[in-house]
């Protein structure tokens, strides 16, 4: 199944009411944000909220270190880096019909998500650590290390003004933490998609 076909299938399920809350997650630079945006744009914006979870990654994660690698900083591959209780509260509020004011960040202004919209797409790494029962369906993306690094270099240096040397130096640490702490979340997804080498391969398909 190609990406376009999957988006069309999801749009059909969402518009029919079969899927009201969709979780999209995966490691950094796996392609989850691009897919979420494409799906969001294929839907009627007056009926859908897109809740991005990056603002729920705590800025205080530098205060802790991985137990098995105390020389490393904590990346978003560890659950301790996420404000999961706050995120779950906001998801439940939207599902209950209440408005939510999103967290303001330097890269994204705060906005009000309307509880009157019946459809909710939650996108970001945090989704992998949340109870699966919050979602009607979950989709997880991943890539091989080479693809992840290429995407990080392209995105973080141009869009986020990152330093290429830092990205290269931190890549091994990020990948190690992904393999040790985050990869296990992939087994919970209803749909698992491999985007290595910019291909689109569905590995698990429960639709």
Predicted segments with their positions:
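ATP-dependent NMP and nucleoside kinases share a basic, alpha-helical "lid"
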Residues: 109-158
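Conserved nucleotide-sensing/catalytic segment adjacent to the nucleotide-binding pocket
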Residues: 52, 58, 62-107, 119
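NTP-dependent small-molecule kinase module
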Residues: 1-13, 154-158, 176-207
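Hydrophobic positions on the alpha1 helix immediately C-terminal to the Walker A/P-loop
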Residues: 35
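Conserved lysine of the Walker
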Residues: 32
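Post-Walker A helix-loop "phosphate-sensing" segment adjacent to the P-loop in P-loop NTPases
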Residues: 41-50
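Short hydrophobic/aromatic beta-strand immediately N-terminal to the Walker A/P-loop
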Residues: 23-25
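The conserved Walker
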Residues: 28
């Amino acid at each position: 199944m190609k990406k376009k076909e999957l988006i069309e299938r999801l749009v059909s399920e969402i518009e029919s009411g079969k899927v009201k809350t969709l979780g999209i997650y995966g490691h950094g630079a796996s392609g989850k944000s691009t897919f979420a945006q494409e799906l969001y744009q294929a839907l009627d914006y007056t009926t859908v909220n897109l809740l991005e979870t990056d603002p729920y990654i705590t800025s205080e994660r530098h205060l802790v270190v991985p137990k098995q690698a105390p020389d490393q900083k904590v990346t978003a591959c560890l659950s301790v880096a996420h404000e999961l209780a706050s995120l779950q509260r906001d998801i439940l509020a939207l599902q209950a019909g209440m408005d939510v004011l999103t967290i303001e960040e330097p890269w994204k202004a705060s906005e009000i998500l309307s509880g009157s919209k019946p459809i909710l797409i939650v996108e970001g790494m945090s989704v992998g650590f949340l109870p699966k029962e919050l979602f009607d369906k979950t989709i997880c993306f991943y890539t091989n290390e080479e693809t992840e690094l290429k995407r990080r270099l392209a995105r973080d240096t141009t869009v986020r003004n990152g330093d290429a040397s830092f990205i290269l130096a931190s890549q091994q640490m990020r990948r190690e933490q992904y393999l040790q702490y985050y990869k296990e979340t992939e087994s919970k997804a209803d749909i698992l998609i491999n985007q290595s080498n910019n291909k689109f391969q569905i590995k698990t398909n429960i639709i």
